[in-house]
Amino acid sequence: MSFLLHQSRFFTTVNHLRDLPATSQPEICFAGRSNAGKSTAINILCNQKRLAFASKTPGRTQHINYFSVGKADEPTAHLVDLPGYGYAEVPGAAKAHWEALLSTYLQTRSQLRGMILMMDSRRPLTDLDRRMIEWFAPTGKPIHTLLTKCDKLTRQESVNALRATQKGLAEYRTAGYQGELTAQLFSALKRVGIDEAHELIESWLIPSDKGETDAAQ
């Protein structure tokens, strides 16, 4: 099966809000704690080994990486790799810069269609994961959680982790969050949930009504 995400390449790096590219294509951002497997997940979803890089020192990378999707000269969309969060050794000034950059990007970027939030399936919905959800909540845009590294859990533990996450996300709906909140199990090592994630991401990037119009032509 061919996926749009397989046509991905590095586009640019952003260190400050003023450097955000003046692009019009839809964007999907990838967020998650340091060591949650974000870079690995991006690479396997894009069918590449070294598209997204994990810092040798977790949490040290404090910039945003853009990847274009589709034709090189006429991208269909962009994937946006946000800095990993939650690593204790990051200096206070770097944390403050990261928080300002991410919260403003998440709340004001009009091109952003949704967030893919990576959580280690063994430790889902940490306080910092919840902060990411709460930063994004005012936009009303969808959040899809990938519970990574589920290969490290038994089948029953995986089911329990997914149920616990879905229950936690349901609390935001009860509190009035308007965006769609979904979750799935994911393992890059065992290739669990890859097709499911592909289909959801591409449905955000290419709305079904456009696909139906193209098919009719």
UniProtKB/Swiss-Prot annotation:
<keyword id="KW-0717">Septation</keyword>
<keyword id="KW-0547">Nucleotide-binding</keyword>
<dbReference type="GO" id="GO:0005829">
    <property type="term" value="C:cytosol"/>
</dbReference>
<dbReference type="GO" id="GO:0046872">
    <property type="term" value="F:metal ion binding"/>
</dbReference>
<dbReference type="InterPro" id="IPR030393">
    <property type="entry name" value="G_ENGB_dom"/>
</dbReference>
<feature type="binding site">
    <location>
        <begin position="148"/>
        <end position="151"/>
    </location>
    <ligand>
        <name>GTP</name>
    </ligand>
</feature>
<dbReference type="InterPro" id="IPR027417">
    <property type="entry name" value="P-loop_NTPase"/>
</dbReference>
<feature type="binding site">
    <location>
        <begin position="59"/>
        <end position="63"/>
    </location>
    <ligand>
        <name>GTP</name>
    </ligand>
</feature>
<dbReference type="InterPro" id="IPR006073">
    <property type="entry name" value="GTP-bd"/>
</dbReference>
<keyword id="KW-0460">Magnesium</keyword>
<protein>
    <recommendedName>
        <fullName>Probable GTP-binding protein EngB</fullName>
    </recommendedName>
</protein>
<keyword id="KW-0479">Metal-binding</keyword>
<feature type="binding site">
    <location>
        <position position="61"/>
    </location>
    <ligand>
        <name>Mg(2+)</name>
    </ligand>
</feature>
<keyword id="KW-0342">GTP-binding</keyword>
<comment type="function">
    <text>Necessary for normal cell division and for the maintenance of normal septation.</text>
</comment>
<feature type="binding site">
    <location>
        <position position="39"/>
    </location>
    <ligand>
        <name>Mg(2+)</name>
    </ligand>
</feature>
<feature type="binding site">
    <location>
        <begin position="32"/>
        <end position="39"/>
    </location>
    <ligand>
        <name>GTP</name>
    </ligand>
</feature>
<keyword id="KW-0132">Cell division</keyword>
<keyword id="KW-0131">Cell cycle</keyword>
<feature type="domain" description="EngB-type G">
    <location>
        <begin position="24"/>
        <end position="207"/>
    </location>
</feature>
<dbReference type="InterPro" id="IPR019987">
    <property type="entry name" value="GTP-bd_ribosome_bio_YsxC"/>
</dbReference>
<feature type="binding site">
    <location>
        <begin position="81"/>
        <end position="84"/>
    </location>
    <ligand>
        <name>GTP</name>
    </ligand>
</feature>
<dbReference type="GO" id="GO:0000917">
    <property type="term" value="P:division septum assembly"/>
</dbReference>
<dbReference type="GO" id="GO:0005525">
    <property type="term" value="F:GTP binding"/>
</dbReference>
<feature type="binding site">
    <location>
        <begin position="185"/>
        <end position="188"/>
    </location>
    <ligand>
        <name>GTP</name>
    </ligand>
</feature>
<comment type="similarity">
    <text>Belongs to the TRAFAC class TrmE-Era-EngA-EngB-Septin-like GTPase superfamily. EngB GTPase family.</text>
</comment>
<dbReference type="Pfam" id="PF01926">
    <property type="entry name" value="MMR_HSR1"/>
</dbReference>
